[in-house]
Amino acid sequence: MTDATTARLDDWAKKQTAAEELIPLVGRLYRENDVLLTLFGRSLLNKSVTGMIKAHRYARHFLGEELDIQITHRIVKALSGLNLAPARIDLGRLIEKLDDPNADVDAFLAAELAGVVESQSGKGETRDVVLYGFGRIGRLLARILIDRAGGTGMRLRAIVVRRNGDSDIVKRASLLRRDSVHGAFDGSIVVDEENNTIQANGTLIQVIYSNDPSEVDYTAYGINDAIIVDNTGKWRDEEGLSKHLACPGASKVLLTAPGKGDVKNIVFGVNDEAILDSDNIVSAASCTTNAITPVLKAINDKFGVRNGHVETVHSF
Protein backbone atom coordinates (compact mmCIF):
# COMPACT_ATOMS: atom_id res chain seq x y z
CA MET A 1 0.00 0.00 0.00
CA THR A 2 1.05 3.59 -0.57
CA ASP A 3 1.91 5.89 2.31
CA ALA A 4 -1.29 7.87 1.67
CA THR A 5 -3.44 4.74 1.85
CA THR A 6 -1.80 3.61 5.07
CA ALA A 7 -2.19 7.07 6.60
CA ARG A 8 -5.93 7.12 5.77
CA LEU A 9 -6.46 3.69 7.29
CA ASP A 10 -4.53 4.65 10.42
CA ASP A 11 -6.58 7.84 10.75
CA TRP A 12 -9.83 5.89 10.38
CA ALA A 13 -8.71 3.37 13.00
CA LYS A 14 -7.97 6.20 15.45
CA LYS A 15 -11.44 7.64 14.84
CA GLN A 16 -12.99 4.24 15.46
CA THR A 17 -11.09 3.85 18.71
CA ALA A 18 -12.21 7.28 19.92
CA ALA A 19 -15.81 6.56 18.91
CA GLU A 20 -15.77 3.20 20.71
CA GLU A 21 -14.63 4.93 23.88
CA LEU A 22 -17.13 7.77 23.46
CA ILE A 23 -20.24 5.60 23.16
CA PRO A 24 -20.32 4.22 26.74
CA LEU A 25 -19.43 7.64 28.18
CA VAL A 26 -22.35 9.27 26.36
CA GLY A 27 -24.70 6.52 27.51
CA ARG A 28 -23.55 6.65 31.13
CA LEU A 29 -23.97 10.42 31.35
CA TYR A 30 -27.52 10.05 30.10
CA ARG A 31 -28.52 7.15 32.34
CA GLU A 32 -26.86 8.35 35.53
CA ASN A 33 -27.09 12.15 35.23
CA ASP A 34 -29.84 12.65 32.65
CA VAL A 35 -27.39 14.62 30.52
CA LEU A 36 -28.13 14.37 26.80
CA LEU A 37 -25.13 15.15 24.61
CA THR A 38 -25.69 16.52 21.13
CA LEU A 39 -23.50 17.73 18.30
CA PHE A 40 -24.98 20.80 16.65
CA GLY A 41 -28.46 19.65 17.57
CA ARG A 42 -28.03 15.96 16.71
CA SER A 43 -28.19 13.51 19.60
CA LEU A 44 -25.14 11.31 20.19
CA LEU A 45 -27.11 8.84 22.30
CA ASN A 46 -27.20 5.25 21.02
CA LYS A 47 -24.95 6.00 18.06
CA SER A 48 -22.95 3.25 16.40
CA VAL A 49 -19.22 3.67 15.86
CA THR A 50 -19.78 4.75 12.27
CA GLY A 51 -22.71 6.96 13.32
CA MET A 52 -20.51 8.73 15.86
CA ILE A 53 -17.85 9.41 13.22
CA LYS A 54 -20.50 10.64 10.76
CA ALA A 55 -21.84 13.04 13.39
CA HIS A 56 -18.39 14.64 13.58
CA ARG A 57 -18.27 14.84 9.81
CA TYR A 58 -21.64 16.63 9.90
CA ALA A 59 -20.07 19.37 12.03
CA ARG A 60 -18.31 20.73 8.94
CA HIS A 61 -21.57 22.49 8.02
CA PHE A 62 -21.09 24.69 11.09
CA LEU A 63 -17.33 24.80 11.59
CA GLY A 64 -16.20 24.72 7.97
CA GLU A 65 -14.30 21.51 8.66
CA GLU A 66 -14.81 18.11 10.26
CA LEU A 67 -14.73 18.17 14.04
CA ASP A 68 -11.82 16.25 15.52
CA ILE A 69 -13.36 13.35 17.43
CA GLN A 70 -10.33 13.25 19.70
CA ILE A 71 -11.27 16.69 21.06
CA THR A 72 -14.83 15.52 21.68
CA HIS A 73 -13.47 12.48 23.50
CA ARG A 74 -11.40 14.71 25.81
CA ILE A 75 -14.42 16.91 26.54
CA VAL A 76 -16.79 14.02 27.25
CA LYS A 77 -14.25 12.23 29.41
CA ALA A 78 -13.88 15.40 31.48
CA LEU A 79 -17.67 15.79 31.67
CA SER A 80 -17.88 12.30 33.13
CA GLY A 81 -15.85 13.49 36.09
CA LEU A 82 -18.24 16.34 36.89
CA ASN A 83 -21.32 15.99 39.08
CA LEU A 84 -23.76 17.34 36.51
CA ALA A 85 -27.44 18.07 36.95
CA PRO A 86 -29.91 17.08 34.19
CA ALA A 87 -29.08 19.05 31.06
CA ARG A 88 -28.85 19.02 27.29
CA ILE A 89 -25.31 19.93 26.26
CA ASP A 90 -24.39 20.71 22.66
CA LEU A 91 -20.76 19.66 22.37
CA GLY A 92 -20.42 21.39 19.02
CA ARG A 93 -21.36 24.79 20.44
CA LEU A 94 -19.22 24.10 23.49
CA ILE A 95 -16.14 23.21 21.48
CA GLU A 96 -16.63 26.32 19.32
CA LYS A 97 -15.83 28.34 22.45
CA LEU A 98 -12.64 26.37 23.10
CA ASP A 99 -10.06 28.63 21.46
CA ASP A 100 -7.09 26.39 22.21
CA PRO A 101 -7.60 22.61 21.75
CA ASN A 102 -4.69 22.06 24.15
CA ALA A 103 -6.18 24.27 26.87
CA ASP A 104 -7.11 23.06 30.35
CA VAL A 105 -10.40 21.31 29.56
CA ASP A 106 -11.39 20.89 33.21
CA ALA A 107 -11.14 24.61 33.91
CA PHE A 108 -12.95 25.43 30.67
CA LEU A 109 -15.88 23.14 31.49
CA ALA A 110 -16.08 24.31 35.10
CA ALA A 111 -16.57 27.86 33.84
CA GLU A 112 -18.94 27.08 30.96
CA LEU A 113 -21.13 24.62 32.85
CA ALA A 114 -21.19 26.24 36.27
CA GLY A 115 -24.98 26.39 36.09
CA VAL A 116 -25.54 22.66 35.67
CA VAL A 117 -23.45 21.12 38.41
CA GLU A 118 -25.36 18.79 40.72
CA SER A 119 -24.85 20.97 43.80
CA GLN A 120 -26.99 23.67 42.20
CA SER A 121 -29.81 21.55 40.81
CA GLY A 122 -31.03 18.18 41.98
CA LYS A 123 -31.68 15.31 39.63
CA GLY A 124 -35.08 15.55 37.98
CA GLU A 125 -37.99 13.20 38.49
CA THR A 126 -39.50 11.00 35.82
CA ARG A 127 -42.88 11.94 34.36
CA ASP A 128 -45.34 9.28 33.28
CA VAL A 129 -46.53 9.51 29.68
CA VAL A 130 -49.52 7.73 28.15
CA LEU A 131 -50.12 7.56 24.41
CA TYR A 132 -53.86 7.67 23.75
CA GLY A 133 -53.99 6.12 20.31
CA PHE A 134 -51.26 4.20 18.55
CA GLY A 135 -51.33 5.27 14.93
CA ARG A 136 -48.21 6.35 13.10
CA ILE A 137 -47.70 9.49 15.20
CA GLY A 138 -48.15 7.46 18.37
CA ARG A 139 -45.67 4.83 17.24
CA LEU A 140 -43.03 7.39 16.29
CA LEU A 141 -43.50 9.10 19.66
CA ALA A 142 -43.12 5.70 21.31
CA ARG A 143 -39.81 5.15 19.50
CA ILE A 144 -38.46 8.48 20.75
CA LEU A 145 -39.60 7.88 24.33
CA ILE A 146 -38.18 4.35 24.33
CA ASP A 147 -34.88 5.58 22.90
CA ARG A 148 -34.59 8.12 25.74
CA ALA A 149 -35.93 5.93 28.53
CA GLY A 150 -32.67 5.80 30.47
CA GLY A 151 -32.86 9.36 31.78
CA THR A 152 -35.18 10.99 34.27
CA GLY A 153 -37.45 12.85 31.88
CA MET A 154 -40.49 11.38 30.14
CA ARG A 155 -41.26 7.73 30.77
CA LEU A 156 -43.67 5.88 28.46
CA ARG A 157 -45.97 3.86 30.69
CA ALA A 158 -48.95 2.87 28.56
CA ILE A 159 -50.83 3.10 25.30
CA VAL A 160 -54.63 3.24 25.13
CA VAL A 161 -56.33 1.74 22.09
CA ARG A 162 -59.54 0.07 20.95
CA ARG A 163 -59.37 -3.69 20.71
CA ASN A 164 -59.33 -4.74 17.08
CA GLY A 165 -59.87 -8.48 16.89
CA ASP A 166 -57.77 -11.40 18.04
CA SER A 167 -54.02 -10.94 18.57
CA ASP A 168 -54.52 -7.17 18.53
CA ILE A 169 -51.46 -6.54 20.68
CA VAL A 170 -49.29 -8.69 18.39
CA LYS A 171 -50.35 -6.64 15.37
CA ARG A 172 -49.64 -3.36 17.15
CA ALA A 173 -46.19 -4.58 18.19
CA SER A 174 -45.52 -5.53 14.58
CA LEU A 175 -46.41 -2.01 13.44
CA LEU A 176 -44.06 -0.59 16.08
CA ARG A 177 -41.25 -2.71 14.63
CA ARG A 178 -41.55 -1.29 11.11
CA ASP A 179 -41.93 2.15 9.55
CA SER A 180 -41.82 2.97 5.85
CA VAL A 181 -39.58 6.01 6.37
CA HIS A 182 -37.75 5.49 9.67
CA GLY A 183 -37.14 1.80 9.05
CA ALA A 184 -36.97 -1.05 11.54
CA PHE A 185 -37.15 -0.45 15.29
CA ASP A 186 -33.66 -0.43 16.77
CA GLY A 187 -33.94 -2.98 19.52
CA SER A 188 -35.94 -5.85 20.96
CA ILE A 189 -39.73 -6.07 21.26
CA VAL A 190 -41.38 -8.75 23.40
CA VAL A 191 -45.15 -9.20 23.63
CA ASP A 192 -46.92 -10.60 26.70
CA GLU A 193 -50.48 -11.30 25.53
CA GLU A 194 -51.60 -12.61 28.91
CA ASN A 195 -50.73 -9.37 30.73
CA ASN A 196 -51.32 -7.04 27.76
CA THR A 197 -47.82 -5.58 27.79
CA ILE A 198 -45.16 -4.79 25.22
CA GLN A 199 -41.56 -4.64 26.35
CA ALA A 200 -39.51 -2.50 23.98
CA ASN A 201 -35.86 -2.65 25.00
CA GLY A 202 -36.09 -1.82 28.72
CA THR A 203 -39.46 -0.06 28.58
CA LEU A 204 -42.50 -2.01 29.78
CA ILE A 205 -45.60 -0.59 28.08
CA GLN A 206 -49.04 -1.43 29.40
CA VAL A 207 -51.63 -1.80 26.64
CA ILE A 208 -54.98 -0.52 27.92
CA TYR A 209 -58.12 -1.25 25.93
CA SER A 210 -60.80 1.44 26.05
CA ASN A 211 -63.38 3.03 23.78
CA ASP A 212 -63.55 6.40 25.53
CA PRO A 213 -61.10 8.59 27.50
CA SER A 214 -63.38 8.77 30.53
CA GLU A 215 -63.29 4.99 31.07
CA VAL A 216 -59.65 4.66 32.14
CA ASP A 217 -58.27 4.60 35.68
CA TYR A 218 -54.53 5.03 35.21
CA THR A 219 -53.78 4.67 38.89
CA ALA A 220 -54.87 1.02 38.62
CA TYR A 221 -51.69 0.51 36.56
CA GLY A 222 -49.45 2.52 38.88
CA ILE A 223 -49.57 5.55 36.60
CA ASN A 224 -49.80 8.96 38.27
CA ASP A 225 -49.60 12.64 37.28
CA ALA A 226 -49.39 11.53 33.66
CA ILE A 227 -49.23 13.51 30.47
CA ILE A 228 -51.83 12.04 28.11
CA VAL A 229 -50.76 12.43 24.49
CA ASP A 230 -53.92 12.17 22.41
CA ASN A 231 -52.84 11.24 18.90
CA THR A 232 -56.25 10.05 17.69
CA GLY A 233 -57.45 13.47 16.54
CA LYS A 234 -61.00 12.49 17.49
CA TRP A 235 -61.31 15.04 20.31
CA ARG A 236 -59.85 18.44 19.45
CA ASP A 237 -61.67 20.97 21.60
CA GLU A 238 -61.43 21.65 25.32
CA GLU A 239 -64.69 19.87 26.12
CA GLY A 240 -63.66 16.62 24.44
CA LEU A 241 -60.06 16.62 25.64
CA SER A 242 -61.15 17.38 29.20
CA LYS A 243 -62.42 13.80 29.37
CA HIS A 244 -58.81 12.74 29.79
CA LEU A 245 -58.35 15.01 32.81
CA ALA A 246 -61.30 13.37 34.54
CA CYS A 247 -59.40 10.07 34.64
CA PRO A 248 -57.54 9.19 37.87
CA GLY A 249 -53.80 9.51 37.27
CA ALA A 250 -53.99 12.05 34.41
CA SER A 251 -52.87 15.66 34.85
CA LYS A 252 -52.03 17.17 31.44
CA VAL A 253 -53.19 16.60 27.86
CA LEU A 254 -51.16 17.12 24.70
CA LEU A 255 -53.00 16.91 21.37
CA THR A 256 -51.04 15.96 18.25
CA ALA A 257 -53.52 17.59 15.87
CA PRO A 258 -54.74 21.16 15.38
CA GLY A 259 -56.79 22.24 18.38
CA LYS A 260 -60.14 23.95 18.14
CA GLY A 261 -61.71 26.74 20.17
CA ASP A 262 -59.61 27.94 23.10
CA VAL A 263 -57.00 25.16 22.80
CA LYS A 264 -53.59 26.72 22.14
CA ASN A 265 -51.77 25.50 19.02
CA ILE A 266 -48.07 25.47 19.82
CA VAL A 267 -45.04 24.98 17.56
CA PHE A 268 -41.91 24.62 19.67
CA GLY A 269 -39.39 27.33 18.92
CA VAL A 270 -42.01 29.57 17.36
CA ASN A 271 -44.66 30.35 19.98
CA ASP A 272 -43.99 27.97 22.90
CA GLU A 273 -43.61 30.98 25.19
CA ALA A 274 -47.42 31.15 25.12
CA ILE A 275 -47.67 28.01 27.29
CA LEU A 276 -48.54 28.80 30.90
CA ASP A 277 -48.08 26.55 33.94
CA SER A 278 -51.85 26.69 34.35
CA ASP A 279 -52.48 25.23 30.88
CA ASN A 280 -53.66 21.64 31.24
CA ILE A 281 -54.56 21.13 27.57
CA VAL A 282 -52.27 22.14 24.71
CA SER A 283 -52.13 21.25 21.02
CA ALA A 284 -48.84 20.56 19.24
CA ALA A 285 -50.55 21.49 15.96
CA SER A 286 -50.38 19.30 12.85
CA CYS A 287 -47.47 17.46 11.24
CA THR A 288 -47.61 19.84 8.29
CA THR A 289 -47.67 22.90 10.54
CA ASN A 290 -44.63 21.68 12.48
CA ALA A 291 -42.78 20.90 9.25
CA ILE A 292 -43.33 24.25 7.56
CA THR A 293 -43.72 26.84 10.33
CA PRO A 294 -40.12 27.06 11.66
CA VAL A 295 -38.72 27.46 8.13
CA LEU A 296 -41.52 29.77 7.07
CA LYS A 297 -41.04 31.97 10.14
CA ALA A 298 -37.31 32.31 9.47
CA ILE A 299 -37.94 33.25 5.83
CA ASN A 300 -40.76 35.63 6.73
CA ASP A 301 -38.72 37.34 9.46
CA LYS A 302 -35.76 37.84 7.12
CA PHE A 303 -37.35 38.47 3.72
CA GLY A 304 -41.14 38.48 4.08
CA VAL A 305 -43.63 36.08 2.50
CA ARG A 306 -46.57 37.20 0.35
CA ASN A 307 -48.18 33.83 -0.28
CA GLY A 308 -47.27 30.17 -0.52
CA HIS A 309 -48.39 26.65 -1.30
CA VAL A 310 -47.73 23.49 0.70
CA GLU A 311 -47.88 19.86 -0.44
CA THR A 312 -47.67 16.93 1.98
CA VAL A 313 -46.76 13.28 1.46
CA HIS A 314 -47.91 10.79 4.08
CA SER A 315 -46.17 7.57 5.08
CA PHE A 316 -47.29 4.53 7.05
For each feature predicted by the language model, list its residue ranges.
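N-terminal Rossmann-like NAD(P) cofactor-binding subdomain of oxidoreductases
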Residues: 2-316
